[in-house]
């Protein structure tokens, strides 16, 4: 009855690695290299493109699939050389941590985890982040190395192709984009996720300086106040999971007010210190706040 929603752990008993694959093309340009590979699974075909850009901090992966299977789960596996017992998965304005081992029954049944824009693995000396633009199911498992220690495998769930309630679920053409970033902090992972999901838009007009800069927090959204006052509304949050001192610089702003989610001034929001174009305030772990910036009319 819950075919499209449920994922049972025994799906791993019939796991099949796609072996019918080959490099089909290599494109070399002045600022990038693309390696195109093609693969086939029964009646379906896939293309995976590795994109290496000059000066980029990470590697991009573009996946396309012409999918015509039923009741088959398709995953993209990305092995990473890191010994760790946990992984971080982004939620809205924060992240959760889940074990990568199955030492307890609780851990074993967390075999699939939902994440928004990125997954991150870390230990004392290195870290990896994998950002995506359109898939939300992940599993990370720990494996014994042939040499010593362990390595981790990150797998993104691409399609499930259930038969109920839609017998044609996931049939047809699909595209996904990923970015693999080495030595990535939480803020690096957030940035990679934003870059994949919020593409740059070029607009015409005169150049201008940004009306504000902020450090110590992540800006999630910027909007004009709904009352048409000309005020600017920022929603910011602490992303790393610890207390942070935030500095907001807005040289043209006459005042900054901490508001609730409905843009109303609230004493429950962080206390703002400073003025004359620069304000500071404190945020606790994963705290969200809304700031209203007023400018001279």
Question: Residue locations for each model-derived region?
Answer:
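C-terminal (or distal) subdomains of carbohydrate-active enzymes
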Residues: 1-297
């Amino acid at each position: 009855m819950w075919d499209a929603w449920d994922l049972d752990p025994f799906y791993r008993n019939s796991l099949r690695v796609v072996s019918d694959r080959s490099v089909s093309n290599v494109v070399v340009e002045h600022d990038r290299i693309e390696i195109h590979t093609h693969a086939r699974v029964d009646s379906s075909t896939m293309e995976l493109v590795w994109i290496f850009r000059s000066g980029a901090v990470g590697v991009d992966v573009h996946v396309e699939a012409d999918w015509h299977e039923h009741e088959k789960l398709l995953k993209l596996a990305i092995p990473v050389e890191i010994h760790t017992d946990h992984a971080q998965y982004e939620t809205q304005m924060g992240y959760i941590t889940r074990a990568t081992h199955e030492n307890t029954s609780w851990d074993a049944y967390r075999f699939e985890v939902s994440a928004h824009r990125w997954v991150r693995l870390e230990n004392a000396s290195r870290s990896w982040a994998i950002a995506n633009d359109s898939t939300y199911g992940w599993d990370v498992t720990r494996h014994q190395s042939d040499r010593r220690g362990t390595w981790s495998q990150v797998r993104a769930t691409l399609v499930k192709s259930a038969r109920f309630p839609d017998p044609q679920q996931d049939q047809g053409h699909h595209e996904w984009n990923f970015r693999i970033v080495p030595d990535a902090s939480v803020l690096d992972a957030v940035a990679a996720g934003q870059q994949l999901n919020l593409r740059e838009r070029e607009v015409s007009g005169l150049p201008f300086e940004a009306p504000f800069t902020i450090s110590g927090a992540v800006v999630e959204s910027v909007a004009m106040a709904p009352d048409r006052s000309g005020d600017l509304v920022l929603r910011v949050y602490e992303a790393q999971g610890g207390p942070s001192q935030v500095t907001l610089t807005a040289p043209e702003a006459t005042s900054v007010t901490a508001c609730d989610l409905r843009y109303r001034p609230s004493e429950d929001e962080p206390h703002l210190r400073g003025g004359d174009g620069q304000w500071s305030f404190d945020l606790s772990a994963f705290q969200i706040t809304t700031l209203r910036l007023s400018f001279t009319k």
